[in-house]
C-alpha cells in the first residue's frame, strides 16, 4: 500500500533551507483568545522507531515559538513519545518530518487508532484503494507522501531541555494548560508551487473533528468485532463526548456479566483506553436514538448495573487529580428493557420534593433532575429521581446536549459519581483547584472574544455563510471562571 520514489515529489517543487526555511511564511492560526501562541493544528508528524525502523504518523499540535522552532505536543501515551524515549535512551538526535495537506485520507490516517508498529500510510492506501507514493525528505531520511502541500523537515534533540507549551483551546471544549514538551527544530521547508495550507479549529462540540470521530466509529467497528469482541453489534462516540468521554456500544448478550467483559476489554484496547463513561445496551437498540437510550437509562438500577473501574484517561482530561489517570464507569443496560413490564410501567413524572431552582425538563425523558449551585455547596438529594446532576449556576440555560458535554468533561467518576439510595448523584460542577482531591489546576471553557464575534457578525453576508447564526460563544461565556485559560 506504499511505494517509495528516489526522485522528487510535488511537495518538493519549492525547497527552502537555512534562514529561508521560515515558519512565518505559513499562515499559522492563533485559534482562541487565551492560546499561548499560534499552532499548527493539522500536522502529520512522521517519525521512525530507531530500533525497528517502523514509521509512525501521528497528529500532535505544534506551537510556533519562532521561525525555526516549535513545540511537539507528544502525550506520554502516544507512539511519537515512545519513539522520543527510544532516541533518548540511545543518545541520538531524532529526525522528524511534518507533512501538511495532500490527500485528506493522510490526515485522517494520522488520527486513526492504529495498533502500535503499524504504518498509518498502509491504512491510507487501503482506504483510498491505491498505494501512497512516498518521497525522501531533503535534510533527513524520512519518507513523506509525494503529493502533500507542505513538508516541514527537522529534528528533536532528546538531550535538550523541554520547553513550556500552551495553553491551547482544545477539542475537549476547554483549554489544555501549559506543560513542558520537546522542541522541534526546522531544517527545511518544502512545498508545492500551488500549496494550500490546511488548518482546523477545535473547541466546544460539535466542531470539524466530530466527523473524524464518526469515520473512526465506522472504519474500526469490524476490527473490534473480529479481533476483540465478536458480540459487539454497533458502537458510537457521541459528539458531546469529544471522542473519549462517552461511548455507547450494543452487544449480543448471552450470559451474565457479558457487559462487564466487553467494557473491560474495550478499556484495554487502543485509544478506547481513554473512555470514561460507557453505556452497554442490548443488540437491536439504535445506539444513536436518544429516545431508545433514555428508556433504558430510566430503568437501570444504579447500584446493580454500574461497573466501576479506574485506569488511563486522556492527558487532556482536566477533571482528574492525577493527570492521565482516573475513574471509569460502565452502565450495564443490557437487561434494563426487560426489567419492567412496559404495559405496567408509568412514564409520568412523579410528584417530587425538589430543591429550589431545579430544572425538570429532562425528568420525563431521562429521569434526571438538575440542580445549580456554587462549587462545594451542599445540595439535598431528592428521593424518587433516577439521576440527580449538579452544575454551576452559569450552566442553568444550557441545552441538554451541552449539559451532557459539561457533565462528562467535568467529572472524575471516582470522586464525582455516587449512589444515594436508588439515585445516581453526579457532581458536574467546576472543581476548585487543589481542594478535596480536586485537580491542581482547572481550565476555562473555550470561547471567542467579543471582538472576533462582532467582526464575524458584521461581515457575515460578505463571507457567504447563508442564514445568520448567533455565535454560541456569547452563551458559553457565562461559564468562564476567570479572564484567562484557567481558574
Walk through the language-model features, giving the residues of each.
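Charged, compositionally biased interaction regions
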Residues: 1-33, 103-487
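Internal mixed beta-strand/loop scaffold within catalytic domains of large alpha/beta enzymes
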Residues: 13-99
Amino acid at each position: 500500500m506504499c511505494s517509495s520514489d528516489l526522485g522528487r515529489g510535488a511537495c518538493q517543487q519549492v525547497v527552502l533551507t537555512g534562514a529561508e526555511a521560515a515558519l512565518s511564511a505559513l499562515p499559522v492560526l492563533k485559534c482562541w483568545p487565551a492560546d499561548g501562541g499560534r499552532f499548527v493544528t493539522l500536522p502529520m508528524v512522521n517519525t521512525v522507531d530507531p530500533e525497528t525502523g517502523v514509521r509512525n504518523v501521528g497528529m500532535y499540535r505544534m506551537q510556533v515559538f519562532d521561525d525555526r522552532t516549535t513545540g511537539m505536543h507528544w502525550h506520554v501515551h502516544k507512539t511519537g513519545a515512545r519513539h522520543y524515549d527510544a532516541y533518548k535512551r540511545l543518545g541520538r538526535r531524532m529526525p522528524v518530518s511534518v507533512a501538511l495537506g495532500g490527500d485528506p485520507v493522510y490526515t485522517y490516517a494520522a488520527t486513526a487508532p492504529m495498533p502500535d508498529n503499524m504504518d498509518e500510510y498502509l491504512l491510507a492506501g487501503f482506504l483510498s484503494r491505491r498505494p501512497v507514493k512516498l518521497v525522501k525528505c531533503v535534510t533527513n531520511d524520512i519518507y513523506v507522501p509525494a503529493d502533500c502541500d507542505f513538508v516541514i523537515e527537522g529534528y528533536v534533540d532528546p538531550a535538550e531541555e523541554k520547553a513550556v507549551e500552551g495553553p491551547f483551546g482544545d477539542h475537549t471544549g476547554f483549554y489544555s494548560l501549559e506543560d513542558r514538551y520537546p522542541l522541534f527544530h526546522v531544517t527545511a521547508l518544502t512545498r508545492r508551487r500551488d500549496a494550500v495550507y490546511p488548518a482546523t479549529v477545535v473547541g466546544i462540540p460539535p466542531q470539524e473533528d466530530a466527523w473524524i470521530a464518526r469515520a473512526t466509529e465506522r472504519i474500526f467497528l469490524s476490527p473490534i468485532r473480529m479481533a476483540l469482541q465478536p458480540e459487539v453489534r454497533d458502537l458510537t462516540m457521541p459528539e458531546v463526548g469529544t471522542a473519549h468521554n462517552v461511548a455507547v456500544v450494543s452487544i449480543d448478550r448471552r450470559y451474565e456479566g457479558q457487559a462487564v467483559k466487553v467494557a473491560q476489554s474495550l478499556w484495554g484496547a487502543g485509544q478506547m483506553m481513554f473512555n470514561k463513561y460507557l453505556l452497554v445496551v442490548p443488540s437491536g437498540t439504535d445506539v444513536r436514538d436518544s429516545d431508545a437510550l433514555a428508556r433504558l437509562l430510566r430503568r437501570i438500577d444504579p447500584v446493580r448495573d454500574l461497573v466501576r473501574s479506574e485506569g488511563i484517561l486522556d492527558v487532556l482530561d482536566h477533571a482528574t487529580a492525577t493527570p492521565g489517570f482516573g475513574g471509569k464507569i460502565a452502565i450495564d443496560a443490557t437487561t434494563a428493557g426487560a426489567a419492567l413490564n412496559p404495559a405496567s410501567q408509568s412514564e409520568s413524572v412523579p410528584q417530587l420534593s425538589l430543591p429550589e431552582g431545579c430544572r425538570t425538563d429532562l425528568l420525563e425523558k431521562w429521569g434526571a433532575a438538575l440542580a445549580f449551585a456554587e462549587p462545594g455547596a451542599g445540595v439535598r438529594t431528592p428521593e424518587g429521581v433516577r439521576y440527580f446532576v449538579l452544575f454551576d449556576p452559569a450552566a442553568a440555560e444550557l441545552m441538554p446536549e451541552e449539559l451532557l458535554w459539561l457533565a462528562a468533561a467535568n467529572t472524575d467518576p471516582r470522586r464525582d459519581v455516587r449512589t444515594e439510595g436508588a439515585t445516581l448523584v453526579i457532581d458536574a460542577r467546576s472543581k476548585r483547584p487543589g481542594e478535596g482531591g480536586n485537580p491542581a489546576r482547572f481550565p476555562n471553557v473555550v470561547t471567542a472574544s467579543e471582538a472576533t464575534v462582532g467582526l464575524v457578525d458584521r461581515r457575515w453576508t460578505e463571507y457567504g455563510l447563508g442564514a445568520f447564526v448567533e455565535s454560541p460563544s456569547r452563551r458559553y461565556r457565562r461559564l468562564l471562571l476567570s479572564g484567562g485559560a484557567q481558574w
